C-alpha cells in the first residue's frame, strides 16, 4: 500500500515538473517575441538578441557570430538554446524541496507519515476500532455472534456451565456416582 502511494506521488511530481518546463518554455517564446522584456530566471543565462535582430545596434557592426556581453560557458555555444520539452530548467531541486510542495489531488495530505503515526489514523471500515489491543485485553471484548457469552472460562469452571441441548441435565457425574446409581 505504501509503495503504491509513493509511486503515485512520484509520478504526479514528475508530471508537474514536465508541465512547469512546458509553461516556462512557452513564456520564454513569448519573451523572445518581446525584445523589450528581459527576465532572467535563476540558473539561466540572460536571453541574447537573435543574429537577425539589427535594431538597437550601437557599434554599427554586423551581429554575425560575435558575442554581445561576457562569453558564456561551454565555448562553442554562444547563444542560449531554447530548452527541449521534458528537460528540467533551472537548478535541480533537492529531495527536501519537493516534499514541501502542496499535495496533489489523490495523494495523501501533507508530508508522508511515518509508520508510528499511521496507527493513530481513524479506523477504516471493517477494521477493529481504535489501536490494536494486546493479548490480555482481547478477553474483555464483547462477544461476537455465535461465540459463547462472556470471557472464555478456564478448565475448572467448565463443569459449572449450563447444559447444552442433547447433553444430560446437570453437571457431569463422577465415575463413582454412575456405578452407585446403576446398582
From Swiss-Prot:
GO terms for cellular component: extracellular space. This is Acidic proline-rich protein HP43A. It is found in: Secreted. InterPro entries: Pro-rich. Residues 1-14 form the signal peptide. The keyword Signal applies. The keyword Repeat applies. Keywords: Repeat, Secreted, Signal. Residues 86-183 have a biased composition (Low complexity). Residues 52-65 have a biased composition (Acidic residues). Sequence repeats lie at residues 81-100, 101-120, 121-140, 141-160, 161-180. It comes from the Eukaryota.
